[in-house]
Amino acid sequence: SIRRQRQMCIRDRIQVGQDAASSVYVNNKKKACAYIGIDSVSYELKEATTEAELVELIEKLNHTEKVHGILVQLPLPAHIDEDRIIRTISPDKDVDGFHPVNVGRLWLGETGFVSCTPAGIIQLLKYSGIEIAGKECVVIGRSNIVGKPMAALLLRENGTVTVAHSRTADLKEVTRRADILIAAVGQTKMITAEYIKEGAVVIDVGMHRDAQNHLCGDVDFEDVYSRASAITPVPGGVGPMTIAMLMNNCVQAARD
């Protein structure tokens, strides 16, 4: 238990409004904290909370010595500038790994907090014995949260990396070169077997509800399953690894 360490890791979670998906994620993170012995405090703020009020709360937590990690649940209401809020969090308490300082450290190969979903994917590949070095790695999606840090981490592991996106010409031609395909495109079951090279490793970052209200990802699992050598399911694939890496960042914040 973390409580047996010299310092107690207290992680503060801030949620503005009542976005249903955000509430599920916050609940899962709260359970994970309790399981490993991290003390966590939730701030559930009203939808009408102003940007200035949120900045003031974060600044207060930045200067609270016993708080080692601060997490602001995204997305935020439209009237709040997410970039400003992310920049307000102290880089040393930015356990999500979104602050520009930590993003810069990642690209420079320096030590810092790494965005949790990409970090979890790297650990998943390593644990599964999948070689990254020298492999053709294609990331579909260029978001600051998944796509860009994913590319940086794959480069760090000596993968040959291509980042595809909505403006990529002939996406299927690009993805069919991939030994490792990371789908973070944000479209329900978009990636079918025709996008996949025989024997490719497929990592599905998406999380959606299909027409039957079942959870599914960016990859059409049933269509791709027989073509891939390994594939992550939704749910139960990338999601748990994301939370595990968040817990790892929290522990690191307390130790540092």
Predicted regions and their residues:
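Single conserved hydrophobic/aromatic residue that forms the stacking wall/gate
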Residues: 1-10
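Glycine-rich phosphate-binding loop
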Residues: 66-76, 80-84, 177-210
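Short, well-structured alpha-helical segments in soluble
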Residues: 53-65
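Short beta-strand segments
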Residues: 15, 71-75, 140, 246
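Rossmann-fold NAD(P)-binding glycine/threonine-rich loop
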Residues: 85-90, 94, 99, 103, ...
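Glycine-rich phosphate/diphosphate-binding loop of Rossmann-like nucleotide-binding domains
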Residues: 16-30, 112-201, 214-222
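Anion-binding alpha/beta catalytic cores of soluble intermediary-metabolism enzymes, centered on
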Residues: 72-132
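Short beta-strand elements in bilobed, periplasmic/extracellular small-molecule ligand-binding domains
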Residues: 11, 33-47, 161-163
